[in-house]
């Protein structure tokens, strides 16, 4: 009787997984890519950096080399203690398109990136804003063109893909990129069905009026992180949000090099998610619950060999469906190599996520440098 109930439970969570992977994530994975027409609208590219001198030297020139007729580059130095501000000042002297915003430590907003970004957004002279981070670089000289091509009169928020550079012979790098792929497949899929809920600040564009319509970051200013996902969670609607996933629109940054650094980064991300709207917390929680439950139920039923052929069939079919859904997404996002490890990476992430939840119950994660 107990095992029969467990089998029904396995079937139920497998069904939930099919709904996610086919009906939601599949809206992105299996959809034909949409291409927008170049708009050539004036754009303010905004980069907020804190102690990123080494990256600034390499990546700001790549931003200035963009094939785009009218844009300014707003460089925000968030009270850096290294050479970041000096480098920004040099770029401002050398190129009239560069505008420097200097942010000094403010007791009311100590170490708060949202305060720095707010000053940068107010300083931007153009209505259309394109964001990336100080440690990111565009995948092509057409990054601005591609991201802005998705703007229309109605679509005033564009979610882009912030990828991580590949590192040969690094298992951790593959795990991080797999997680990034899974996360992107989720928020692109939900955006495609009219339920946008998050984005990444490494690659995000929106019209300035969207920022002021929700009073900027004021409603969550005390939450140290979330300048990207909490803002989108509040401002994005089915009508005003779209995505951009052409390869030329990607940005890249270097992934964490140690498990500890990556784990702490995940702690920050998950601590922000608890401030999402109730429905978004439910949709994310249900997906994770179905992942964990499916794995545990399958292990128990197979270990006791209860209706093992039926159980094995459900497990195999579930992994095939998930593999196809994520595999097509991986093809679009140029992450195919991580799919060879899919079942192992998924199981590892499920238990890492559980570890993060438990750790966050007992201590608060560190935030902006």
Residue ranges and their predicted role:
Residues 83, 133-149:
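Acidic donor-binding/catalytic loop of UDP-sugar-dependent glycosyltransferases
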Residues 41-44, 72:
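Cell-envelope/extracellular polymer assembly enzymes that use nucleotide-activated donors
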Residues 24-33, 52-65:
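Short, well-formed alpha-helical segments that are part of the catalytic scaffolds
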Residues 287-364:
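Membrane-embedded multi-pass helical conduit in multi-pass membrane proteins
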Residues 1-38, 326:
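N-terminal membrane-anchoring/stem segments of glycan-assembly enzymes
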Residues 60-107:
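Acidic donor-binding segment of Leloir-type glycosyltransferases
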């Amino acid at each position: 009787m107990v095992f029969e109930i467990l089998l029904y439970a396995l079937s139920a969570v497998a069904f939930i997984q099919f709904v996610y992977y086919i009906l939601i994530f599949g809206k992105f994975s299996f959809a034909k890519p949409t291409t927008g027409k170049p708009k050539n609208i004036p754009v303010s590219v905004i980069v907020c950096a804190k102690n990123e001198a080494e990256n600034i030297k390499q990546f700001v020139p790549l931003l200035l080399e963009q094939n785009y007729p009218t844009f300014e580059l707003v460089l925000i130095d968030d009270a850096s203690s290294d050479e970041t501000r000096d480098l920004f000042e040099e770029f401002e002297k050398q190129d009239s398109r560069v505008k420097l915003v200097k942010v000094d430590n403010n007791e009311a907003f100590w170490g708060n990136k949202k305060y720095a970004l707010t000053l940068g957004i107010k300083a931007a002279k153009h209505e259309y804003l394109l964001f990336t981070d100080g440690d990111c670089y565009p995948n092509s000289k057409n990054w601005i063109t591609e991201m802005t091509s998705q703007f229309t009169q109605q679509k005033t928020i564009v979610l882009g893909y912030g990828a991580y550079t590949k590192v040969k012979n690094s298992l951790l790098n593959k795990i991080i990129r797999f997680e990034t792929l899974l996360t992107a497949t989720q928020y692109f899929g939900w955006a495609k069905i009219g339920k946008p809920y998050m984005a990444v600040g490494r690659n995000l564009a929106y019209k300035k009026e969207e920022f002021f319509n929700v009073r900027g970051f004021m409603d969550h200013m005390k939450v140290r992180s979330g300048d990207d996902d909490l803002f989108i969670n509040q401002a994005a609607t089915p009508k005003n949000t779209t995505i951009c996933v052409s390869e030329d629109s990607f940005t890249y940054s270097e992934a964490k090099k140690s498990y500890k650094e990556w784990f702490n980064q995940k702690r920050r991300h998950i601590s922000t998610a608890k401030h999402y709207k109730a429905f978004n917390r439910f949709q994310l929680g249900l997906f994770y619950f179905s992942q964990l439950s499916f794995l545990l139920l399958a292990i128990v039923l197979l270990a006791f060999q209860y209706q093992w052929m039926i159980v094995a069939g459900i497990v195999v079919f579930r992994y095939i469906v998930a593999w196809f859904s994520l595999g097509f997404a991986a093809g679009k996002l140029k992450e195919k190599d991580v799919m060879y490890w899919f079942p192992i990476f998924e199981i590892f992430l499920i238990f890492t996520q559980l570890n993060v939840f438990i750790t966050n119950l007992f201590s608060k994660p560190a935030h902006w440098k």
